[in-house]
Swiss-Prot record:
This is Probable endonuclease 4. It comes from the Bacteria. Zn(2+) 3 binds at H182, D227, H229. Binds 3 Zn(2+) ions. It catalyses: Endonucleolytic cleavage to 5'-phosphooligonucleotide end-products. It is an enzyme of class 3 (hydrolase). Its cofactor is Zn(2+). The keyword DNA damage applies. InterPro entries: AP_endonuc_2, AP_endonuc_F2_Zn_BS, Xyl_isomerase-like_sf, Xyl_isomerase-like_TIM-brl. NCBIfam families: nfo, PRK01060.1-1.
Length: 297
């Protein structure tokens, strides 16, 4: 079954229930959430996440395979500042607990940045951090994300991700999130040769580790190492390639999550594009006037 959804907000009093309601309003049957603001460590206690009501709504609306995203502030690749590394390890452990409580099996993590110390040193630090953070009997996997290679990001090639996975003791607890924008921006030709890229992924990492797909178009040309998401069909990847990936038979059981930009001239009038983009990806017809329609809706 095609599991297609988007990033939604989990906030206010409704928390998980509100996230599921937002996802349902877009015609989604899965979704991704942050457990709080991605740029800080302020979090509500688990008992205030409104989990029971959220799970009931999810069941009634056929929501499944939901995904949690770890916050950006976690950087277990930092070997320069021990306090940043320790914060990352400790906060990752508490995020895993929240993920489990929410009933999710995957928590997406940007592997980390080496902050000028070089990829090898960054990767060693990430391995150390994951070895500290992972508890062997946990039932949540950390889904390491394919990165664009912006700045000092680690995980910009399949080889770098494989290096991290191979170094972690309990690597059965590691999976991978394949982000179409990041992978394109890292230099992989997912537009003309997605099957070739997928075969390469399978040889280097193993397709069985692929557990989450982030479906985003890109504002930049292939290999730009920028990581700037575009709306579906309005970037350098294009609708046909993204539709092909979403409906790829080898990826049929993997949740597909949109993280495309809100549409509008200014912050106050921006609108979520997900209802329209999900419908387009399901029915297979690109609407070149979509952005105007969203703005005028």
């Amino acid at each position: 079954m095609l599991r297609l959804g988007s990033h939604v907000s989990m906030s206010g009093k409704k928390m998980l229930l509100g996230a599921s309601e937002e996802a349902a309003s877009y015609g989604s049957n899965t979704f991704m959430i942050y457990t709080g603001a991605p740029q800080n460590t302020r979090r509500k206690p688990i008992e205030e996440l409104n989990i029971e009501a959220g799970l009931e709504h999810m069941k009634a609306h056929d929501m499944a395979d939901i995904v949690v995203h770890a916050p950006y502030i976690i950087n277990i690749g930092n070997s320069v500042k021990p306090e940043t590394f320790e914060l990352g390890v400790n906060f990752l452990q508490s995020e895993i607990e929240r993920t489990r409580a929410l009933g999710a099996k995957q928590i997406v993590l940007h592997p980390g940045a080496h902050v000028g110390e070089g990829a090898d040193k960054g990767i060693k630090q990430i391995i150390q951090g994951l070895n500290e953070a992972l508890i062997h009997d946990q039932d949540v996997q950390i889904a390491l994300e394919t990165m664009a290679g912006k700045g000092s990001e680690c995980g910009r090639t399949f080889e770098e991700l494989a290096q991290i996975i191979d170094g972690v003791t309990h690597n059965e607890l590691l999976s991978v999130t394949f982000d179409t924008c990041h992978t394109h921006d890292a230099g992989y030709d997912i537009v003309n040769d997605f099957d070739g890229v997928l075969n390469e992924f399978d040889k280097i990492i193993g397709i069985d580790r692929l557990k989450v797909l982030h479906i985003n178009d890109s504002k930049n040309e292939r290999g730009a190492h920028k990581d700037r998401h575009a709306n579906i069909g309005f970037g350098h990847i294009g609708f046909d390639a993204l539709h092909y990936i979403v409906h790829h038979p080898q990826l049929s059981n993997i949740p597909k999550i949109l993280e495309t930009p809100y549409v509008g001239e200014d912050k106050a009038s921006k609108k979520a594009p997900y209802k329209w983009e999900i419908a387009m990806l399901r029915n297979g017809e690109f609407d070149p006037d979509l952005l105007n329609k969203i703005q005028n809706s």
